[in-house]
Amino acid sequence: MNLEIGGAVDPATSARRLQDAVKQVAGRGWHVQTLTRLATIDTLKDQLMDLPVPLVVNHFGNARAELGVQQPGFAALLELVRAGKAYVKLSGAHHISSRAPDFPDAAPLAQALIRANPDRVLWGTNWPHPDSSGRRSVQEVSPFVEVDDGRLFNELPRWAPDAALRRKILVDNPARLYGFG
């Protein structure tokens, strides 16, 4: 769920929408997956810590790669991950970095999230890579962004050098979250 539809950021609205989503999925064995910014994560941290369902945060929490691990709000995301209260997807590097094609400035963020709790990190492609760079009318079709998923996948060993760690990120953690196996 997008906690910031149209780029509007209102903590009260985000909190209410989150609670509505939780009510819908509670008791079904489902999780809530969010697209949000670090500022919203920071503001709602206490509420997120108390969710009765698993939380998945997309796109590195929408951190800005060029600002690194000390940017405002990143500590709140690390705290949620460290406490086992959120999974974070290492997905959509092209959303958080402008340094294509390898997005090297995303590496410190990925490494910090993995160090915080390797059992709460997932990897994803964000395929088919929708373009969310601006508002469009409901009649306009968003073009897809060209992203080399294979090349991004090849960054994972730099983010997680240990094969057992990569297995957690790619196999064990998704299996636990989605109930595979």
Please report, for each region that a protein language model flagged, where it lies by residue.
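Short, catalytically relevant binding-site loops at active-site mouths
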Residues: 38-41, 61-65, 94-96, 176
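Distinct, well-ordered alpha-helical segments
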Residues: 10-15, 38-53, 66-79, 100-111
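Short hydrophobic/aromatic-enriched beta-strand-loop microsegments
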Residues: 1, 54-60
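Short, basic, helix/turn surface patches
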Residues: 59-68, 117
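The start of beta-strands in P-loop NTPase/AAA+ ATPase cores
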Residues: 53-54, 121
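Active-site gating/metal-coordination segments in enzymes
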Residues: 1-39, 46-49, 82, 87-95, ...
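H/E-rich (His + Asp/Glu) clusters that bind or coordinate divalent metals
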Residues: 70-181
